[in-house]
Design a protein with these regions (language model features):
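A short beta-loop-alpha structural element at the N-terminal edge
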Residues: 3-17, 28
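Conserved GNAT-fold acetyl-CoA-binding loop/helix
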Residues: 23-42, 79-88, 97
Length: 208
């Protein structure tokens, strides 16, 4: 049975590995963003530095799931900007492998942002992933329950998360945990990788 605990900076590599493995619609992501190290530096480390209620699920000493959260956007944005300034020169010099696929992904993030819910009502957001081998055993539910409890204790009024209509298992979990779809729209973000656009959704949960 997996045990949920607070995430620490020492968990960076384990979280980055799992996050990178599942970034492509819950499946392996190296063809989308080849460097696991760069992924961790840009999309995991800022949460461990400036996020809130970060959690991991461990089973026999191995991280099998995580939630990375933020209670507000500004501290996270500053932490991300700092990491990006560090990473860009190294990326262009080829330190993380061929620059083009990484730059392509980053530019598409800027060009095709997903729908958002109002930040005054839903200031917090989260990212969650569970190792495919550990799915179906309540790991995601345990992580989300602990995360929502942490947000309530901090007085956060609401939380939002992003997913796609294609991520059926995750959508079922979110619905079971009291989330609902707030907004959705077709997005071409994944089209170069899948050959078609996907419906991007923002889900919300009120905590008051």
């Amino acid at each position: 049975m997996a045990q949920v605990r607070k995430a620490h900076p020492k968990d960076l590599a384990a979280i980055a590995r799992l996050s990178h493995q599942t970034l492509f619609l819950g499946r392996e992501g190296p063809k989308v963003f080849p460097s696991e190290t760069l992924w961790g530096a840009l999309f995991v480390a800022p949460y461990l530095e400036a996020g809130c209620c970060n959690l991991v699920a461990e089973e026999e000493g191995r991280v099998v799931g995580y939630i990375l959260g933020a209670c507000a956007d500004r501290p996270l944005a500053l932490a991300f900007a700092k990491r990006l300034l560090w990473a860009l020169p190294r990326l262009l010099l080829g330190r993380f492998g061929p620059p083009l696929p990484h730059l392509r992904y980053l530019l598409r993030l800027l060009r095709y942002p997903g729908p958002k819910a109002p930040k005054d009502r839903y200031p917090a957001h989260l990212h969650i992933a569970v190792d495919p081998e550990a799915q179906g055993h309540g790991v995601g539910k345990a992580l989300l329950a602990a995360f929502l409890k942490c947000l309530r204790e901090k007085g956060v009024p609401g939380v939002q998360l992003a997913t796609t209509r294609a991520n059926r298992a995750a959508r079922g979990l979110y619905r079971a945990m009291g989330f609902r779809v707030y907004a959705k729209r077709a997005s071409p973000f994944w089209a170069p990788y899948l050959g078609r656009p996907l419906i991007h959704e923002v889900w919300v949960r009120d905590l008051e």
